[in-house]
Amino acid sequence: MVTATHSQSSVGRLRHLARQYAALTKPRVTQLAVFCAIIGMFLATPGMVPWSVLIGGAAGIWLLAGAAFAINCLVEQKIDALMRRTAWRPSATGEITTTQTLIFSAVLGGAGMWLLHVFANDLTMWLTFATFLGYAVVYTILLKPATPQNIVIGGLSGAMPPALGWSAVSGTVPAEAWFLVLIIFTWTPPHFWALALYRRADYAKSGLPMLPITHGERYTLLHILLYTLIMIAATLLPFVYGMSGYIYLVAALGLGLVFLGYAWKLYRNYSDGLAQRTFRYSILYLSLLFAVLLVDHYFKFVPQV
């Protein structure tokens, strides 16, 4: 009886520890990044993506993204401890030590590099490693504590997944892949600044120079509106370039107009609740936009003239 209880207790501790390590990888953010990478894989070929590339490539990108987020948690552990939104993270509470986090990140990164080398190609491996450095070092260490434009300048690393997926299949990164990167790059500021606005009290504690803290609410709202317009323009590039048809065009315009409606309402009559709804919609927006792009890829509709 004692042995069984001890065994159950050990299993419970292991499960808790596994959840804590998983939390370091920011699973929700990683899922969206890998989803966009997988869409990039399918858009790179008119047929089916080879299963080995699909599974091995996606896993490799997932692991390297998780490694980058773990380093982010490590670097920002003291900042996270000050913020209500992030104080629970195991790096902030000290439940997982600095050494353990470094080892965990190294294992994830090494495994991800190996998977991409074996199941994708070296171009994808090195591009993903460069993305890891861009997020973990350039954004987290250099840009985020230095400038309120951190999310704009550092947004390239977060926008890379479609190009990584594309290169995993084709071994190249053509203009079409960069259109997808540009969409996410222009989507990132209004997405993140909506969060920063309704969490501005938290960010004020952190000491980080976030735009709502350094330039105020009104300035940030204007930038959300302007970047939303730029983002909508960027989403039209796949249609203009001929890589998508009318199914995507209609969806891109419809989804974009809803996003613009949120941005305009925020600018006219701000509330934390509306900013939170805008942030949540932005995640749904990107997911639906890329999903429709995939549907359009296989069922492209272009009316005959």
UniProtKB/Swiss-Prot annotation:
It is found in: Cell inner membrane. It is a multi-pass membrane protein. Keywords: Cell inner membrane, Cell membrane, Heme biosynthesis, Membrane, Transferase, Transmembrane, Transmembrane helix. The keyword Cell inner membrane applies. Its main location: membrane. GO terms for molecular function: protoheme IX farnesyltransferase activity. GO terms for biological process: heme O biosynthetic process. Its EC number is 2.5.1.141. It is an enzyme of class 2 (transferase). It catalyses: heme b + (2E,6E)-farnesyl diphosphate + H2O = Fe(II)-heme o + diphosphate. PANTHER family: 4-HYDROXYBENZOATE SOLANESYLTRANSFERASE, PROTOHEME IX FARNESYLTRANSFERASE, MITOCHONDRIAL. Carbon 2 of the heme B porphyrin ring is defined according to the Fischer nomenclature. HAMAP family: CyoE_CtaB. This is Protoheme IX farnesyltransferase. The gene is ctaB.
